[in-house]
């Protein structure tokens, strides 16, 4: 699992179109810009507690995390039921869906192809952080 720090320089404003775009037939009247959004402010709430991790595998596709995505993990967030967390279970780091009922914690895969994840009562669980967002490059930049 590759973990990356975050280097923030100047803001990165990106134009935001005024209207949402349908996934069907496009409207030529919807091409004006409403405002600009700074991707750093949108994706990173607490910089000192945030890092990036490259996703490996397909166990979390039901939560929108795909192989080779970059997960944005925030250590300052307290996990809530249904959150995707980066966790260390008995020395093995992975992403799981978090559930807590009283003092009992359960972790789950988000892919029906995987069997249920059984957390033994003696398991040592350390939450590294909550996945607050992810980056899914649809097309990788060509490097030469």
Show the residue positions of the predicted features.
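A short glycine-leucine-enriched loop at secondary-structure breakpoints
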Residues: 63-66
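Short beta-strand-centered aromatic/proline hotspots
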Residues: 83-85, 95-100
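Structural motif
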Residues: 68-69, 83
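Short, charged beta-turn/beta-strand-edge "cap" motif at the junction between a beta-strand
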Residues: 76-79, 91-93
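Catalytic Cys-His active-site segments of thiol-dependent hydrolases/isopeptidases
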Residues: 106-112
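Short, positionally conserved secondary-structure boundary motifs
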Residues: 1-61, 92-93, 100, 104, ...
């Amino acid at each position: 699992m590759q973990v990356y720090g975050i280097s923030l320089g100047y803001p990165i404003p990106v134009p935001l179109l005024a209207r949402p775009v349908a996934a069907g037939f496009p409207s030529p009247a919807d091409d004006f810009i409403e405002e600009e959004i700074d991707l750093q402010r949108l994706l990173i709430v607490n910089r000192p507690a945030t890092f990036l991790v490259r996703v490996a595998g397909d166990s979390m596709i039901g939560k929108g995390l795909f192989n080779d995505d970059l997960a944005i993990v925030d250590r300052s967030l307290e996990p809530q039921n249904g959150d995707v967390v980066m966790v260390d279970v008995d020395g093995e780091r992975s992403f799981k869906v978090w559930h807590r009922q009283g003092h009992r914690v359960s972790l789950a895969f988000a892919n029906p192809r995987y069997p249920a994840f059984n957390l033994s009562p003696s398991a040592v669980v350390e939450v590294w952080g909550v996945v607050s967002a992810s980056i899914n490059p649809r097309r990788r930049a060509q490097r030469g």
